[in-house]
Each structure stands twice: as C-alpha cells, then as structure tokens.
Amino acid sequence: MKRARFEDDFNPVYPYEHYNPLDIPFITPPFASSNGLQEKPPGVLSLKYTDPLTTKNGALTLKLGTGLNIDKNGDLSSDASVEVSAPITKTNKIVGLNYTKPLALQNNALTLSYNAPFNVVNNNLALNMSQPVTINANNELSLLIDAPLNADTGTLRLRSDAPLGLVDKTLKVLFSSPLYLDNNFLTLAIERPLALSSNRAVALKYSPPLKIENENLTLSTGGPFTVSGGNLNLATSAPLSVQNNSLSLGVNPPFLITDSGLAMDLGDGLALGGSKLIINLGPGLQMSNGAITLALDAALPLQYKNNQLQLRIGSASALIMSGVTQTLNVNANTSKGLAIENNSLVVKLGNGLRFDSWGSIAVSPTTTTPTTLWTTADPSPNATFYESLDAKVWLVLVKCNGMVNGTISIKAQKGTLLKPTASFISFVMYFYSDGTWRKNYPVFDNEGILANSATWGYRQGQSANTNVSNAVEFMPSSKRYPNEKGSEVQNMALTYTFLQGDPNMAISFQSIYNHAIEGYSLKFTWRVRNNERFDIPCCSFSYVTEQ
C-alpha cells in the first residue's frame, strides 16, 4: 500500500497539533490488528469494545447493574438476594427443594415411592387393576356394576324393594308383627289355635263343629242353621225373623218389645196384679160372678132405675138429650155471642176484642205499622269497601205516605278509606222483590256494601227488629225508577256535601235508584279528594215508593 504524503509542516508525533482529523493521514503501523483495535478517531489507535465494557479514568472496566459489584480482590460479585416460594427453599445462598413422602431423592434425581397397586409403565405412574375396576372412555377410574347395584348418583348403592330396606346404613329385612327376630332368625309369632306341625309348618288346631273339608276350614251345621253363599244363616219362621242382621220377634198390639223383654201395652181399666192381667175397677164398680156390676148409690141429678143409670134434666137448664143415642148437649144460643167449638162452649169475639193472658175479654191494641228501616242509632263497624269492616255506615229510610225520606253518613275506620286515591267511591244496597235485604250480591271496584253481620231492620227504640219479611212499601217505585236505567237521569238525584264536614272540601253526592237488573236497589256515589279520609256527613235523599 502506498502511504499518503504528509504536509511539510505535519508533526507525526502524537498528539497531532491543530489538524483536522479528516486530514490526518492513515499511519497505522503494519503490526496493528483490527480485531479488538480500531483507529478512532482517525490517526488514534484505540480499543474496540461493546457493553458491558467501558472505560473509567482511562482504564477498561465493566458496567455494573443493580446487585453487582467488584470486591476488593477485583472479583465480580453479587449482593442480590434470590426470592423463592414453597416448595423451593434457600439455605446459605443455596437453593433447594422441600418434599415429603412419597417423593424421594435418588441418584440426585427426584423420584416417587409407590407400592401396589401402583406401578411405573413407560415412565408414567400407572395403576394395576382387575375387574370389576376399569378405566372408562373418559380415562376415569370406574367400576363395572350390575343389578341390583347402581351408581346413578356417583355413589355405589344397592337397590332394594320391600321387604328389604336400609336401616342405619345396614341392609335389613323390614317386617312387622306377627314376624320377629329370634337369635337373628326371622320367626313367626303364633298363638292358639295356631301351632307348628312336626314339619315346621303353621297349622290350625280345631274341634267340632269346625272341620277340614277339601283342605278348607268349614263348619258342621244342623237345623235351624244353614250355610248359604259362604255365610252361616239361621232359618226362621213367624213370629221370628231376621231384621237389621238381628234375630227379631214379630208382635202385634197389645204386645210390644221393651228393653226388658216382651210386654203388653195396657190401656185404661187394665192392670197387672202380680203376674196376672186384671181389671182395674173404680168407685161404683165391682166384680160379681166374674162380671162387672155397678156398686153405687146414685146421687142427684143421677138416678138408678130399672138397672139403668139415668140423668135427670130440668126444663130450664139449657141442657137437652138429642139424637138416637140420647147424647147430652148444651143448648147454646149462637146468635147471642156463644158457640160450640171442639166440644166446648165458647164466647164469640167481635172486631177489637181479644182474650188476654188470663183468659179475660180485653180490647185489642191498635196495630202500629213500622215507618222506619235503619242500621240502628249507633252501629259498630258494619260495612266493607276495600277490606272487611273498614267503615261504619248510618242508613235510615223513613216512610212518609208515598215517599221515603232517607239519610246516609259514613265514617272510615281503617285501610284504604283513610287515604283513598280513587276518583269516586260508592255505597250500594240490594233488595229482593219483597223488599228484604239481599246479602252477598257481587259489587264492583270502589263499591261498599253492608257486611253480613250488620244490623238492618225496623226501628225499635234505639235498636232494630231484624225480622223483616216484607218491606215493599219502603222500596223505590219500579215504574218511576225502572230497573237497569241507573245511567239515565230519571233514576238519579244529584246534590253536594262537604267531605269530613269541612266547608272547604265540597264534593258531589249522587243517588241512583233501581240500577240493578232485578229486585230493588239503592246506590250512593261521592267524589273523592285524593288521600283525604273518606268521612261523609249526613246526606239526605228521597224517592217515590212502590206502595
């Protein structure tokens, strides 16, 4: 290689003075190698190195990261700690491994200790097995089973039917009397007439009239007993018979059956004297030669004449003997207030008269027609709107000639009525065609009715007579207020009232008569103020009556 020519003023002694590095000629000695050496900058021979080598204070050294240092002997060392977790351990800066049986260290290698039925096949742990143990299609250890065993729930179980069953996890025979266990053997408890024969079979001991016929127990019979349809019967003839599965004796009067036995029904004049039937004679009668004769002295107005007992009748006694049988009768003047009724002389009473409790003639009191139907003056909670007995209702109907004047008021007691949210609330009453109260009639939402336990009847003082059998005269006229026309004005009356009696809470009050499809009905409807207690003061209404 031809060397470059130096400038005349170039000083070849390092370091070069004031020359542009690019102008310095290549003057590397021919003995310098490019392996580990380089000319950098140009004209300067230097070491060629990469990380982690570097220079420090003109000396070649190493770049040291965290945990590395050079000790005083110039050796590279580390003060970094190695963190380990179980089963790896670190003792005196030596990393180890914790293990327990069946793991073991053999020839500096970790191995597994095992016993039968385990085995190692092709460097894999295997299990020696024989039937019924097997490996199923899912490579799971399984058990070959057959009935009565099953493993549907993952547990090997024994299927059993009565009389076999599990008791305290033990297969047992289930039994009840007369079976019992005797020295762990199932035994039959027997009592006479059962017994064990010589061949250990259960036999029946019997004696006449029982007998064995065609290997069946039967009964020897003689008259009056017979066997029919497998039943023992008793042949009977009158007066004996079988009634209600009991032997009975047929009797005709005067015989009868009592708790103590057969008896005779004795009428007047007959009696029992010891064990004999005798005639019971009263005063004036006697037995003479086996016949009944009179034994009396006749006192007036009776007389005994010609073997006959006779009655003497005066001409002014109002008594007469009439008819073929000569019956004694009273000669009553029926046009003068007397009459014969049920063989008794009675007084005939005209209008306005009656017999009092002492049997005396008295003037009949004037009949008073009820004029008021009501729920009493102060009822208990008696109406149901949203829940049972959630309100108290005062309803009064007063009959006045051809009109009824009525009033109604309501006091909320509980539930929804204390804070109602509906637009309107109604109270309805239904009546049958005879004007009697109709209970359990279906109602719609936001409608109330009297509860079945409520009192409704004619006013009787401050209470009510609930014996109302006909109250048509109190009902709305079916001509003036036709049925099923409750939505038409002819059946309505409309006015206003004040909720809770507060003049600042005016609400509408509507009365509708005979809105139901049959019978009679009353319906009262009020507008609701939202969440305001539904207390309605006394509201008046009137209508034309049926009668």
Curated annotation (Swiss-Prot):
- Keyword hit for Glycoprotein: no
Q: Which GO terms describe its cellular component?
A: host cell nucleus; viral capsid
Q: Which Gene3D superfamilies does the record cross-reference, listed alphabetically?
A: 6.20.10.20, Adenovirus pIV-related, attachment domain (2.60.90.10), reovirus attachment protein sigma1, domain 1 (2.10.25.20)
According to its UniProt record, what is one Pfam family this protein matches? Answer: Adeno_knob
Compartment annotation: Virion; Host nucleus
Q: What is its main location?
A: virion
Looking at the record's lineage, which domain of life comes first?
Viruses
According to its UniProt entry, one GO biological process term is:
adhesion receptor-mediated virion attachment to host cell
Swiss-Prot/TrEMBL keywords: Capsid protein, Host nucleus, Host-virus interaction, Late protein, Viral attachment to host adhesion receptor, Viral attachment to host cell, Virion, Virus entry into host cell
Q: How does it assemble?
A: Homotrimer. Interacts with host receptor CXCAR. Interacts (via N-terminal tail region) with pentons.
* Biological function: Forms spikes that protrude from each vertex of the icosahedral capsid. Interacts with host receptor CXCAR to provide virion initial attachment to target cell. Fiber proteins are shed during virus entry, when virus is still at the cell surface.
The further comment given in this record reads: All late proteins expressed from the major late promoter are produced by alternative splicing and alternative polyadenylation of the same gene giving rise to non-overlapping ORFs. A leader sequence is present in the N-terminus of all these mRNAs and is recognized by the viral shutoff protein to provide expression although conventional translation via ribosome scanning from the cap has been shut off in the host cell.
Family from the record: Belongs to the adenoviridae fiber family.
Q: Quote the protein name from its UniProt record.
A: Fiber protein 1
